[in-house]
A protein has these predicted regions:
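Binuclear metal-dependent phosphoesterase catalytic core
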Residues: 40, 291-377
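Extended active-site neighborhood of metal-dependent phosphoesterases/phosphodiesterases
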Residues: 36-61, 117-236, 262-274, 291-300, ...
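N-terminal active-site segment of His-dependent metallophosphoesterases
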Residues: 29-123
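Solvent-exposed loop/turn segments at secondary-structure junctions
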Residues: 75-78, 109-113, 150-154, 211-214, ...
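Secretory targeting signals
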Residues: 1-3
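Active-site neighborhood of phospho(di)ester-bond hydrolases with catalytic His/Asp-centered motifs
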Residues: 72-73, 103-107, 144-149, 208, ...
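N-terminal export signals
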Residues: 7-29
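Short acidic, glycine-rich surface-loop motifs adjacent to enzyme active sites
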Residues: 233-250
């Protein structure tokens, strides 16, 4: 949405911020050194079959990985809206033809975070979401993982209380209704739908509540315990999902309150437990980035208000991303579609590096040494 929401986000971290900072800075990433594998020339390795290219008819078809994930985000329209932009409707209709194992949503499924909305209006928004998005995916038997966005159930605190408690109550009521089962294999759903873990096809997924700029200390302790668990560490890959990104990438979002506070300690926490990718929304701009050992998928908006990338003259674009995962190499391939004409966005057309209010993000296909000297001077 292109409406003014910054004031709702900035005040969210009044409680627990300082203790979370000191707790986070005690975390250091752990590096694992592996001995290089030596191939035995006497062993004949099987020929790997070419990946099967799968996509809706007429679209560029990527080769399918061991696991395929369709990633969407920021679906909503204006405050209180119960309908969705045509690109959202089109995407939901196309998704089954990509044959994904999972759909992930980076948040903002409905258009709340306005105190004047009544309970009936909030319920109507979730009903509209169910009819137009969740139910079609359930009928297609495609599991749906998601993170709560600030417009779904903001955790903003004012005068010691949740400012949007009604939004959070309605979100919880909707998602804990057995009729709205998202089809996930939960590991820990005690905090569902705000923070939870699940697994699928060898990948461990952790969802934290990044509906505001600060993640509470008790939730960070839960994050570390979850990632340190034998279930997480025995998985072939680990992916984390939250609404706000670690670092800014978009015009109009390059301010405190629109990114997670203390991004480097948070990144260190994820790196410590070998999380491969952090998927976020909120900035309404697609950027496939990385920082340190962590890949950062900034998911573009599918609904209202796409935004321009920082350090770029590219036009704002509504997007959908298909991730194909190779579990053996622990690598991912992104195919991101411009939902205006369904063309594929070329990674090399995006900025090499984005420098925002709280740090920089490198495009994930590059190394620091490949940047021009002037871009290394940040």
């Amino acid at each position: 949405m292109g409406l003014n929401r910054r004031q709702f986000l900035i005040g969210s971290g009044a409680l627990g911020g300082l203790s979370a900072v000191s707790w986070l800075h005690s975390l250091l990433p752990q590096k694992t050194v592996l001995a290089p594998a030596v191939a035995d020339p006497s062993i004949s390795l099987p020929i790997q079959p070419e990946p099967i290219a799968i996509a809706p008819k007429g679209l560029t078809a990527p080769g399918r990985g061991d696991v395929r994930i369709v990633v969407i985000s920021d679906l909503n329209s204006q405050y209180g809206s119960t309908t969705y932009d045509p690109e959202v409707t089109q995407a939901i209709a196309l998704i089954p033809d990509w044959q994904p194992d999972l759909v992930l949503c980076g948040g903002d499924m409905v258009a709340g975070q306005k105190t004047s909305l009544t309970d009936a209006q909030i319920q109507a928004m979730w009903q509209g979401f169910d009819q137009q998005i969740a139910a079609p995916l359930r009928r297609a038997k495609i599991p749906f993982g998601f993170t709560i966005g600030n417009h779904d159930g903001s955790g903003a605190i004012a005068q010691g209380k949740m400012r949007f408690q009604r939004d959070r109550d309605q979100a919880s009521r909707y998602w804990n209704n057995p009729q709205h089962d998202p089809g996930l294999k939960f590991i820990d759903k005690a905090g569902f739908p705000f923070n939870y873990t699940f697994s699928q096809k060898g990948i461990f997924y952790l969802v934290w509540d990044a509906s505001t700029d600060r993640i509470p200390e008790n939730q960070l302790a839960w994050v570390e315990k979850s990632l340190a668990s034998s279930t997480a560490q025995s998985a072939k890959m680990r992916i984390a999902i939250g609404h706000l990104p670690l670092y800014a990438v978009a015009v109009g979002r390059n301010t405190s309150g629109n990114v997670l506070s203390n991004p480097d300690p948070l990144r260190n926490l994820l790196e410590k437990y070998q999380v491969h990718t952090y998927i976020s929304g909120h900035h309404h701009a697609y950027f496939p980035g990385k920082r340190g050992q962590l890949e950062l998928l900034h998911t573009g908006a599918l609904g209202g208000g796409p935004r321009q990338l920082l350090n770029s003259q590219l036009s704002p674009t509504k997007t959908l991303t298909v991730i194909d995962v190779n579990l053996n190499s622990e690598s991912t391939l992104y195919t991101t579609y411009n939902m205006k004409d369904l063309s594929v966005i070329q990674t090399k057309s995006l900025p090499r590096i984005i420098v925002g209010v709280n740090g920089w993000v490198l495009r994930r296909d590059l190394t620091w040494e490949e940047l021009p000297p002037q871009e290394q001077k940040i």
